[in-house]
Every structure is written in structure tokens, then in C-alpha cells.
Amino acid sequence: MSGRSFMLATRVPMSRTGFEAWLDTPPPSLDVIENPAAMWTGWAAAGDAADWDLTAFADSPHIVAAMRADQRKTPRELLTDRVKTGGCVARHRDEALELYLYDYHADFYRTRTELLMLAGAGRYADVGAHPVLFWGGNVYADLPIAGDPPLSVLVVSRAGAHFVDRYPIDALVESLRPIEAAFLARYEGDGSAEPDLTDAVDPDLRP
């Protein structure tokens, strides 16, 4: 599982009722994030443009249209598509939304939709500030090794969301280990059998 890959992981405490409501609520607009231009600030891609306007695809309007269409899909639609192709944990477990999303040989533009999707989860979250870890590059799909900076950290809450330029990453990584374990378990075996979705995917999202 090496190659240019991008991953998101989070654990956002919320009730089952909140989780189900979030699944059927389209992602909010970019205004939900207080400082979208600061997506890379302080981390491995510091200095790069956030490019929420998708100017990199100015000559490919069909790509921009497809990305904008994804931003109008509900989390249920986005995650159901994910489950079909593998590479994710998406579940409500122990009174929390747990996600681990993996894009192999991809670019990080798709992640903008997923960050908006998770920013929208704050509306249904328990009181508090809840981090979303975004990392990737020419790395494995495992959580970052100690000392390796992520690409970004988004903090979501009932008040909205914002990017931060520092965060106790080692502690965050350790808190995400159980979700990582469920993700890695999907790739056990020789690949001849269909992956067991029981632990990794919520019943509401299974085929």
C-alpha cells in the first residue's frame, strides 16, 4: 500500500441519532471553515496554496463540475461510494463517528469534499473540539510515524471548523489506533476473499 496516497482519520463523539442525521445532510458551504486558506499552514505542505477554488483545473471544467457535484452529495452517498471501492472505515462506534479514508494514487483535491463533509459533522457532535487528521504523500496508508508531520489538522465543533497550525500529533495518532486497526484488518489475507465489512463499516452504509 505504498505510493502517492492521501488519508483522513477522525473520531467525533456524537449520538447514534446525530450520526444518522449527519449521514443525510449535504456538506455545508466553505463558510463553515473559519480559515480555509490556512489548510496547509504549519505542516508538511506549508506555503502551498489551499486552492479551494480549484484553479488547478481551470482548463478542465468537467473535472471541476464533477468535484462540485460531489460537494452536493450527502455523507451517506459519499461514503456508500467509498465502501464499494474499499479503502475506508466508516462507522458509528462507542457513541462516536469513526472514519479512516484512504485514496491510493490520488490527488488531494478530493479531500476537500471530505473535509467539508466532516466540518458538517460538528453540528451533530458532542460539545468540544474534535480533530481531523489529514496526511499523505509517498507513504503507506498507516497513521503517521512519530516525527512525520501531517498535511493538515482540521478541528470541528458545534460552532464550525478551523484549521490549526499546531497540535499534539503523537497523542492524536494514538487515539486513532483502534480505527487504524480496523482499516488494516480489511487488507489481511491473500486478497482472494471479499473483505469482511462487519467491523469497518456501519450497517447503514453496507451494500
Q: Could you describe each region identified by the protein language model?
A:
Residues M1-A45, P207:
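Short, extreme N-terminal segment that most often corresponds to the first beta-strand
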Residues W40-W52, F57:
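Short N-terminal segments
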Residues W52-P207:
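Charged interaction segments
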